Swiss-Prot record:
Function: Growth hormone plays an important role in growth control.
Keyword Magnesium: no
Highest taxon listed in the record's lineage: Eukaryota
Induction / repression: By growth hormone releasing factor (GRF).
Single biological process term from Gene Ontology: growth hormone receptor signaling pathway
Keyword Zinc assigned: yes
Lineage: Eukaryota, Metazoa, Chordata, Craniata, Vertebrata
Gene: GH
Localisation: Secreted
GO molecular function list: growth factor activity; growth hormone receptor binding; hormone activity; metal ion binding; receptor ligand activity
Name the UniProt record assigns to this protein: Somatotropin
């Protein structure tokens, strides 16, 4: 299966990262440091959930002798690679806070649709039991990032529109090898994208508030 075939290129849409009127009412006003702390904690928790779900899927469905080969093939491409988002801490430190928030919002929003179907794929009682909460947690993190953008937008120039890479849905036919590899690839990309968001938020929080014990 060719890299990139897990996703539909027709689903790429241009998104304007404007915030809806009245959105502020859904997220309480609080000090900027608290907004960053809450966003970092949410991103950390989601990244942990993504990593645990990926490992449990691998342990349950992917034979051990095939994991290295499959990782090399399915991890070759994620749609998030089509946007100029920083790939690590050093790259992130070269971007402004507003740029990092825009990239974070794009990455989070790209997973909202597929994550609505995650719980329909994983019906057992393993770590997949948390999958029905992932969408809700993504929405919470989206609101947190939007709240930060509202706080900072008056001080930063508005950036260009970004392409929002929208991932395909998870495949429910787990008896198919192609479906297994597709879902394996999606979970790998989800884990990578959440790691990026967590890194961006930590970089912003550390440099803005001068924390001496930052772990990124």
């Amino acid at each position: 299966m060719a890299p990139g075939s897990w996703f539909s290129p027709l689903l790429i849409a241009v998104v304007t990262l404007g915030l809806p009127q009245g959105a502020a009412a859904t997220f309480p006003t609080m000090p900027l440091s608290n907004l960053f702390t809450n966003a970092v904690l949410r991103a950390q928790h989601l990244h942990l959930l993504a990593a645990e779900t990926y490992k449990e899927f691998e342990r349950t469905y992917i034979p051990e002798d095939q994991r290295y080969t499959n990782k090399n093939s399915q991890a070759a491409f994620c749609y998030s690679e089509t946007i100029p988002a920083p790939t690590g801490k050093d790259d992130a430190q070269q971007k402004s806070d507003m740029e990092l928030l825009r990239f974070s919002l794009v990455l989070i929003q790209s997973w909202l649709t597929p994550m609505q179907y995650l719980s329909k794929v994983f019906t057992n009682n393993l770590v997949f039991g948390t999958s029905d909460r992932v969408f809700e947690k993504l929405k919470d993190l989206e609101e947190g990032i939007q709240a930060l953008m509202r706080e900072l937008e008056d001080r930063s120039p508005r950036g260009p529109q970004l392409l929002r890479p929208t991932y395909d849905r998870f495949d429910i036919h787990l008896r198919s090898e192609d479906a297994l590899l597709k879902n394996y690839g999606l979970l790998s990309c989800f884990k990578k994208d959440l790691h990026k968001v967590e890194t961006y938020l930590k970089v912003m929080k550390c440099r803005r508030f001068g924390e001496s014990n930052c772990n990124i």
